[in-house]
């Protein structure tokens, strides 16, 4: 609302002593011009996949080169996301479920896709994590056809279906319905 925006601008113009704001946005265009004019902009980008893979191998010496390259490609050079996928138990589970989901969607196995998603009907956070991982995998398959065994046509279906389900979940839609529709669209012939 307007009052909140004005209060934020006032604080940004005259911050309390010792206070520094760090604002992030995916695009400078997403920030209001009045706020942008009061900020110093720094553009940040992921590191190249080769550097990301090298950082992964340094952090996880037991990781083989191909897996490091694949993770770096999958997460587009985001070292933190790659390390999380390697070390966080919940992220590992979500990634494994997403890989299986993508495999079954590639085979157009509606039953197995639905069975996998049904396991998340009572756990919105885990469902969101699996769908996010599926969007990452689909995006990777669109950038490199055949990545993780997924072809571009299937990747496009997965991406559309997962994003629609994630939007429905954010809007507090019925989780069971969102996942059912998602599964039907992912495995469509």
Residue ranges of model-derived segments:
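Conserved catalytic/switch belt of AAA+ P-loop NTPases
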Residues: 6-20
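Charged, glycine-rich active-site and insertion segments that engage polyanionic ligands
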Residues: 17-20, 25-133, 137-189
